[in-house]
């Protein structure tokens, strides 16, 4: 059975990838001996993009995307990252947790263990959904615990020892439309149909609302423009956040 997931073509994932790649190029070298850990890697879509910076190891709790990631040729283990991760201290040059920590009651535990795994000077790169008042049915179906403000994310990174290198909102241009749509749906009590609605139980797909081809193409273009803007400035508002923290060379 062929497995398909929306990361390959959905505007939200392609926009996030462009913004992340833009930011990572500012901090990460491209070296064969550069080791990255992608925590909560899903089916490995971002491993493909992270691999341009070095060698990538993935961890994922759900066996379905683990199977898919391995079929794609990625080095992924099934593991619950809320537990101490099975690597020695100072093992990695960078750790990514991309839309991961919002699923966990104890988000600080993941950040703290990621800090342990990083070499001195290593980078922690995070994406999370932004602003609790934007809570929607997508948050419920994806088992989110919270959404964050920039100040909250900075505080959690600092609390676990990281030096803040960059924090920016993402999806700035679509923010007014997204906020209006969420509020209108909330008032109407409407629950949008999600992409995985018709999947067989052994298939895997990230829970994301589908978009028509014209809308998907337009929003993908908006994401390209926004990635160019993120190269220059931190955006003041958006539906998501991207953060980069660095483990100090000495403590």
Task: Label the predicted regions.
Residues 108-123:
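A short glycine-rich, Lys/Arg-flanked "PGG" loop and its adjoining helix->strand segment in the class I
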């Amino acid at each position: 059975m062929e497995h398909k997931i929306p990361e390959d073509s959905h505007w939200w994932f392609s926009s996030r990838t462009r913004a992340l790649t833009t930011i990572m190029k500012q901090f990460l070298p491209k070296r064969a001996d550069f080791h990255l850990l992608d925590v909560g890697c899903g089916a490995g879509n971002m491993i493909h993009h992270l691999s341009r910076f070095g060698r990538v190891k993935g961890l994922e709790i759900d066996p379905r995307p683990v199977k898919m990631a391995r079929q794609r040729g990625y080095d992924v283990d099934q593991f619950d990252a809320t537990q101490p991760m099975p690597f020695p201290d100072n093992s990695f040059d960078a750790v990514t947790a991309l839309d991961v920590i919002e699923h966990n009651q104890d988000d600080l535990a993941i950040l703290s263990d990621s800090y342990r795994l990083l070499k001195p000077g290593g980078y922690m790169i995070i994406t999370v959904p932004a602003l609790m008042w934007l809570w929607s049915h997508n948050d419920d179906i994806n088992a989110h615990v919270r959404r964050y403000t920039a100040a909250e994310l900075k505080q959690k990174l600092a609390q676990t020892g990281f030096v803040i290198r960059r924090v920016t909102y993402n999806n700035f241009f679509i923010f007014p439309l997204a906020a209006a749509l969420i509020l209108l749906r909330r008032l109407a009590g409407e629950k949008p149909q999600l992409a995985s609605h018709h999947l067989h139980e052994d298939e895997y797909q990230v829970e994301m609302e589908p978009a028509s081809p014209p809308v998907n193409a337009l929003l993908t273009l908006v994401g390209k423009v926004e990635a160019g803007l993120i190269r220059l400035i931190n955006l003041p508002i958006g539906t998501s956040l991207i953060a980069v923290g660095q483990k100090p060379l000495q403590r």
